[in-house]
Structures are given as C-alpha cells and as structure tokens.
C-alpha cells in the first residue's frame, strides 16, 4: 500500500464515519446496526484495517497480539464463573458484591476486568463499582456470543497451539483422527465424535462458525444483488435448504415486487411434535427475526433434501452452500450440490424461464477481497484444518460437476464481486447443452 492508498482509505473512512454519525447512534453500534448501514460499516472497518496495516510497526503487532491474547483469557475467566450474569444490566454495583455472587476473589475480579475496559467491554462508572457497557450487555442478552468466545479459548486455541506437534508427528495427514485437536486433547477419536458426545461443544462450535462466517454471508447478499432481479416482476424466489430467514430478509427490501419462500429441510421433531407455526407457515420462534412490514411477502415451507422440488411456479430457486465445517466436510457438501441439482431438473425442465442460482464460498482468499472476506475465508479454513484436518471446497470439482451434466442443466453465467468471498452460478434448463454459456 502506498501513501496515496493511505489517503484514499482515510477519505473513505471519513465518508463512512459521517454516514454513520448522521444516523444518530451517539452510543455506538454495539447493540446492533440498521440493515441499510451494514455496507457502510464494512467499508469503514475494511479501510481502518488497511490503515492499521500500513501505519503499524512490528512492535505494534506484538503488542496487539499480546493484548488480544490476554483479552481472550479474561473473557474466558468471566465465562467460567458467569460473572457477566452477576452484574445488573442497567446499574452499577460494587466489585465486592459481584465477587461474592460469583464466588471469586475480589482482587482477581478487579485485575481481570480492567483490561476489558480498554475495548469498551464493561466499565467502571465510579471508583469501586462495575457496570455493563453497551457491548458487554450483548453477551448477556445473546448467549451465543459468549459461546463463541468459550469455543475459541477452550477448544480452538489449544488446537492451534498444537499445530507444530501435529506436523512433526503426522506431517500433511488428512485423517480426521490425526488433527491438531487430537494432539491437544490426547484423543484418538475424531472431533466429530466429540460433537456427538458433548452437546455443549457442538453448540459453541455453531455459535463460533456463525460469527466467523458472517462476512461470507454478507458476500452472498452482495453477490445476489448483482443478479438481474428487476426483470422478474411479481415473482416468487425459493431459498432452498435455508437455515434461517436472514438472507431473504436482507433481499426483500431491495426487491419489493418479489415474494420469498424460506424452504427448510423437513425433519421429524423429537416426540412427534411439530414446531408451532404462525399463519404464514413460519415457525413462531423464527417469526421475530422477520420485520413486520416484510411478513406478508415471506412464507415458510419444508422439503426433504432428497425429494424433487415441489414448488413448480417460482422464478428463482436459490441454494446457498456454506463453507465446509467439522459437521459438513467438503466431500459431503459436493455431494449436496449434486443432490440439489438433481432435485431441480424436473422443475427447471418444465419452466425454461426459471433459474437456479447456486452460491458457494471461495476456497481460498484472493488479494482483491476486502479484509473481512479474507479473514473469514482464512479463519474458516484454519479452524477446519486444526479440528479435523479437513480442506476447503475444490472449486475445480464443483465446476466439473456443473459442466459435465447430461440432464439439460446449463450454467448460463458465473457472477462474483472481486471484493467478497462468494461465487454464484446461474443455471437453467436447455436442450442444447453441449457447452456452457459462461
């Protein structure tokens, strides 16, 4: 990066900061961010990261790593003793009272929370008293945040530290039982077995992956907005295999003429009970995540992953493939892609105007990606390596799978933004599918 790049970054930071300031959130955005400002926030953070990289000296890097290492340790300590839950959400209390409730020495409590004040986590509004900040309060109201922290400190950090031992013993082994995690815990069983036996670790892993992959999720939205949605008119878009309504909630305001169906995988509920549904067919527990003004355009449905697509009149069938994880290795995801294509052959054959849009995360970071996207790809890849010796998706295999089909499905074009970590394939049914269109 040159000095000219530094000036450009500074100008973009100033522009983004003014936009955020105009929104009127004087207390910051730790409690959440309006959807229309998320892109602005990403721009601000990406440019700030670039400035930090240019202006920092080697000693600054050492200090930063030392600080975050200690901050992670402090947060783990708070989590182990449930200290955050011992502090009222809206008032300050003496350190002594919190220490008594948590059952920890007051002197330790004081020393371990004060480093967190430097990042706006907790605060000391008056001498001898501690209170929640806007940031720390979220770790009480959103337990998944603390789950992610505990997974990093209890599971991932020891595994990362054991990479040298793993390499000396197993080299470049791809066997799940030869991972750095196995070295760290002294077990011969693969990490997947741990997830089956320890629901808490499985829950923590899910929380960690959801936050680490958020930049990839944002990339899906960014890439999809580059598709030609405006010409669809008053059409239906089916989000196939959705884990949540978050993607359609992000797309719906941008395309007000479209209706969306969130199609989850059908699963038998334990005890034979089905989830409570509202009048749009949406599970009541997930209804709250859909803004009131969008609920009339978003409905819910289910389908077995092996079943033929039953929705016959949609204009777009959207399939978002996640980054491989300890629970879903790359080979399984590749098989899922093949299964999804097979399930949609008939519906696309009967409606040649319909499209299937397949989005996948890039298998490796590129120089053109923004800092958040590069970090998301790298963190996801390293986590997979350390926990299972697993690898990323083989994009060559995916492209071969798409090109070699003889069932009439043809890739019409390939779309991606150079700054994010997502690629999209637009697929239609064509009789003359001797070659692909992109």
UniProtKB/Swiss-Prot annotation:
Main localization, broad class: nucleus
Disulphide linkage map: none
One CC-aspect GO term: endosome
UniProt protein name: Aflatoxin cluster transcriptional coactivator aflS
SUPFAM superfamilies xrefs: Winged helix' DNA-binding domain
Localization terms from the record: Nucleus; Endosome
UniProt record, GO biological process: positive regulation of aflatoxin biosynthetic process
Organism of this sequence: Aspergillus parasiticus (strain ATCC 56775 / NRRL 5862 / SRRC 143 / SU-1)
Subunit structure: Interacts with aflR.
Disruption phenotype: Leads to significant decrease in the transcript levels of the genes for early (aflC and aflD), middle (aflM) and later (aflP) steps in the aflatoxin biosynthetic pathway.
Gene: aflS
Function as written in the Swiss-Prot or TrEMBL entry: Transcription coactivator involved in regulation of the aflatoxin biosynthesis gene cluster with aflR. The ratio of the expression data between aflS:aflR plays a crucial role in the regulation of aflatoxins production. A high ratio, produced at a range between 17 and 30 degrees Celsius, corresponds with the production profile of aflatoxin G1 biosynthesis. A low ratio, produced over 30 degrees Celsius, is related to aflatoxin B1 biosynthesis.
